[in-house]
Amino acid sequence: KERVEKLVGSSASFLTVCTFHSFCARFLRREAYLLGFPPSFSILDDEDSGKLIQEVAVEANYKKSDPIVKELRSYISRKKNKGEYPDDIKVNPFYVNEKEMVDMYKEYERKKDNALSMDFDDLILKTLYILKNYPEVRQKWSTRYKHLLIDEFQDTNNVQYELINLLSVDNTNLYVVGDPDQTIYTWRGANQKIILDMPRRYPDLEDVILNENYRSTSPILNVANSLISHNKKRVPKDLFTSQSGGLPVIVKSFSKAEEEADYVVNEIEKIAGKSSDAVYSNIAVLYRSSYLTRPFEAELAHRGLPYRIFGGLRFYQRKEVKDVLAYFRVLVNPKDDIAFDRIVNVPSRKIGAASLEIIKKEATEAKLGEYEYIKNVPSDSEIPNRILVALGALVSKMEKTKERLQERSEAYSAILKDFITD
């Protein structure tokens, strides 16, 4: 988005530049009332939906650590990437426990709907449902955009492609950028056939091959071209670069991670020892996932070589940030039990699992969200008095903050600061 602003200037503020999920969230804030959701519905991230799936599995008499929990999460994701909700699934008799999977999937959806929440996959699926079943809404949004540009098109899955087609039917100019050779998200539903099928689906398609590479040197591109040439189902093209020189590509294979680490650290010592200009801060080791660092760290430490690990959690994935956001999710959506469960003991209010189960049970019986329920607990509640006092203090703090937000007489940042430090 920042790059677009630099290229086109202030007029960039009139553009919609976002991901599929961000666009659908924006769409649903306006149109989800058609499905019975308020504009303030909650959006569950992967951690939130994972906890809800665990809860469903536990209620089905499984343990959180049982393999079926991970299997259920993967099952739900696969089905949603195909655009299938529980009622759309035809149970496969050869899939040993699919009937149980569908039942747990259905319970996951029920809990999520009761909490007026959607997960990331819902954002696209519910947008699709509205566009397909409410022609006046589809026309309103498809005529809004005369030009639709899709980047990294090779990573598009079937439901995203259906969304693109629904938004581009009314004289919309469709422009896609993608490289079938870079399809790396098939595990997440990306379908390479979509981009390869474009010439057939759009007979007037104008195809522009961009094959000059500005990042790599010739030795790297020669290896890449040679490897990818073995794939016969592709758009033929050879990458080239105007950059001269470049070191040859070296490929090594090891039977153990420790052997790999030993080799890499040996090479680091060779490089550092060749020249006074070659300092350790100019050398980087890249890895695919953070768990792979262990043998490298062990070997570097063993030899007394200095190193730093870069990376870690994104800002919005940090615990303290998610805790604060959970408080505000409860304020705008009192039915968001997932957010409430996260903050009820942050900071510690000494509310144990048994007391929390009582809250859940009584709130469910009252057909209320957990926060809605603790705002007006009936006199015959089984919640212990000590817990009621702690909950009362929580409600008082939340409602005071809500009043300040609704008055709109102060900067949100000031209210947030007071809320955190209080």
What are these regions (language model features)?
Residues 1-39, 43, 115, 139, ...:
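P-loop NTPase Walker
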Residues 8-15, 32-122, 145, 209, ...:
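ATP-hydrolysis module of ASCE/P-loop NTPase motor domains
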Residues 21-24, 78, 180-184, 189-193, ...:
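Conserved nucleotide-binding/hydrolysis micro-motifs of P-loop NTPases
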Residues 203-206, 211-306, 329-333, 365, ...:
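Helicase P-loop NTPase motor core
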Residues 94, 279, 293-305, 318, ...:
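Conserved helicase C-terminal RecA-like lobe
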Residues 12-26, 44-45, 305-326:
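Conserved beta-strand -> loop -> alpha-helix junction used to position metal-binding or nucleic-acid-contacting
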Residues 16, 42-49, 95-197, 212-216:
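Conserved helicase NTPase motor core
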Residues 4, 31, 55-59, 223-231, ...:
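Conserved AAA+ ATPase "sensor/coupling" helix adjacent to the nucleotide-binding pocket
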